């Protein structure tokens, strides 16, 4: 559901006439905080071009209360979200999309085919590369131009999704405790 409204959304309701961009995010991850304002700017630009946007938080809020639904509402308001910010309490949506980290991005075309799964851009909290959203923007431009998907999609880097113990997927490898 969307904590701000209580509404439940389907992919069909979220998708624009030209596709859908999904970001698995959370409120506390430094990688998300680093890029979120540029993500919002790109969302505004491409929503006008018929691409739907959604952000989804799937973190375990018992262990990470800063990602709880009420904090999500505040985070979305603070950053001027123009799209739903959904809470995946069961973590089933994150599992269905093979989400691994925050931010984790995917773009789907109008026929629901995944045309991009990769990083927002080359900027990281610890480097001097400006936040631009270049990789995502190139993927969205290719989608709108009906061009083939970008051939070299670099995976997202960020904080691991905070899985509930019984939900951790087989593709998740936790850090060893030191």
How should each PLM-predicted stretch be described?
Residues 153-177:
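Flexible coil segments in periplasmic/lumen-exposed cytochrome c-class electron-transfer proteins
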Residues 1-144, 148-152, 167, 178:
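Chalcogenol-based redox active-site neighborhoods
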């Amino acid at each position: 559901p969307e904590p701000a409204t209580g509404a439940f959304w389907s992919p069909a309701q979220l998708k624009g006439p030209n596709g859908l961009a999904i970001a698995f995010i959370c409120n506390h991850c430094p990688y998300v905080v680093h890029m979120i304002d540029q993500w919002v700017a790109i969302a505004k630009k491409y929503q006008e071009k018929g691409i739907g946007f959604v952000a989804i938080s799937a973190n375990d809020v018992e262990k990470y209360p800063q990602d709880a639904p009420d904090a999500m509402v505040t985070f979305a308001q603070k950053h001027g979200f123009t799209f739903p910010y959904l809470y995946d309490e069961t973590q089933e949506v994150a599992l269905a999309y093979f989400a691994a980290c925050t931010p984790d991005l995917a773009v789907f075309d109008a026929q629901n085919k995944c045309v991009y799964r990769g990083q927002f851009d080359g900027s990281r909290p610890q480097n001097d590369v400006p936040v631009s959203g270049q990789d995502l923007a190139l993927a969205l431009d290719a989608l709108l131009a009906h061009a083939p998907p970008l051939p070299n999609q670099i995976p997202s880097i960020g904080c691991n999704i905070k899985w509930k113990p019984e939900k951790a997927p087989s593709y998740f490898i936790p850090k060893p405790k030191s």
